[in-house]
UniProtKB/Swiss-Prot annotation:
GO biological process, one term: maturation of SSU-rRNA from tricistronic rRNA transcript (SSU-rRNA, 5.8S rRNA, LSU-rRNA)
Family: Belongs to the RRP36 family.
Protein known as: rRNA biogenesis protein RRP36
Biased composition (Acidic residues): 47-61, 122-143
Lineage: Eukaryota, Fungi, Dikarya, Basidiomycota, Agaricomycotina
The entry's keywords: Coiled coil, Nucleus, Ribonucleoprotein, Ribosome biogenesis, rRNA processing
Organism: Coprinopsis cinerea (strain Okayama-7 / 130 / ATCC MYA-4618 / FGSC 9003)
Subcellular location, principal: nucleus
Subunit structure: Associates with 90S and pre-40S pre-ribosomal particles.
Length: 347
């Protein structure tokens, strides 16, 4: 740091000495030679300069003092820090490597992908800036070979777009890849079909159906008989059932009762269908014999259908006219519900 000298009174002797020194300087050689000589002398003989300063101080205490520049302490500290920084770098790298080794592979993979994406974006921005500058200057642009990015076709949206409402539907792309397969020969598409409803199967005939699937009625009768026997055994075992199993046995009895009712309804339906078919066949046979004698076409009415059905039902029931379902009045209402336009066919 430069040393500031205090202002002191100047004597006549000192003024005279200063004038003599100025005259000597004017008579001395050029400034460049003086500087070169002084620099060389300063470098070679540092001790002589110190002695001269001491002589000046000793000759006249009132003469102006000359201050020597010295470097600041801050500059010294900065140089020391710059020398120490390259020494610290290897230790920091080793610490980072140790930290990265402790991380899981999944986290490292995610970080690698993020860095690659950021680097690609920065490269694209730099390339676009270079192209614009080259177009302005008219210089040639070097083309870099880049691989085409693979397009992934997925049903979900990879980019997170802000939605107006959290309950709003997600936007899904409508773009689909074109098939690489080329259709050379068009093959007819296979359509599932049911042979029962094809036109080649012909019209539905109840008589033929009854003859082909008549075994189903017999199997339902046997099933009903077995269910009734099982229900009777379950009710009998209920009396000697322990308390902790009573709920399960009651549920089992209820299930068997429902199965018996369902099977009974199927058996009764099969029996009614058989009676109806027999009554219609009998009426049809009688009308065909009358047509042979010269009678014209005849259409079955609802009242005649009920009469034929009741007559056939009476043949299969008891002579008293009572059935398990009720009397003849309730049976007539049942027959009226079974009337269908199919019964109006001509005979």
């Amino acid at each position: 740091m430069p040393v500031k000298s205090k202002a002191q009174p100047v004597s006549k002797a000192s003024l005279k000495r200063l004038r003599e020194e100025e005259e000597e300087l004017e008579d001395s050689p050029s400034s460049s030679d003086f500087e070169q000589g002084s620099s060389q002398d300063g470098l070679s003989d540092g001790s002589d300069a110190e002695e001269d300063f001491e002589d000046v101080d000793s000759d006249d205490a009132d003469a102006p003092r000359i201050a020597q520049w010295e470097p600041d302490d801050d500059d010294i500290y900065n140089k020391i820090e710059e020398e120490e920084e390259p020494k610290k770098q290897p230790s920091q790298l080793s610490a980072l490597e140790n930290n990265l080794r402790g991380l899981p592979l999944g986290a490292l993979r995610k970080a690698q992908k993020a860095l690659a994406q950021v680097q690609a974006e920065s490269d694209s921005e730099s390339e676009s800036g270079d192209e614009e500058s080259d177009e302005d200057s008219g210089s040639e642009v070097e083309e870099e070979s880049t691989k085409p990015q693979k397009v992934e076709w997925i049903s979900r949206d990879t980019k997170k777009h802000a939605r107006a409402n959290k309950h709003a539907p997600m936007e899904v792309t409508s773009k689909k890849p074109v098939s690489r397969k080329r259709t050379v020969v068009e093959v007819p598409k296979l359509v599932p079909r049911d042979p029962r409803f094809l036109p080649t199967a012909g019209e539905f005939k109840p008589e033929a159906f009854q003859k082909s699937y008549g075994f189903l009625a017999e199997s339902r009768k046997e099933e009903l008989k077995t269910l009734k026997e099982t229900l009777a055994k379950a009710r009998k075992a209920m009396s000697s059932c322990p308390a902790h199993l009573r709920d399960e046995r009651e549920q089992e009895i209820e299930r068997l009762e429902r199965a018996v009712k369902r099977t009974e309804s199927l058996v009764n339906k099969d029996r009614m269908d058989a009676i109806q078919q027999q009554a219609l066949q009998r009426v049809k046979k009688e009308e065909k014999e009358k047509q042979k004698q010269g009678k014209g076409k005849w259409f079955l009415k609802q009242c005649e259908y009920q009469r034929a059905f009741l007559s056939g039902y009476e043949l299969t029931c008891s002579p008293s006219g009572k059935t398990k379902g009720g009397t003849k009045g309730s049976l007539r209402s049942f027959v009226a519900g079974r009337w269908s336009p199919r019964s109006q066919e001509s005979y």
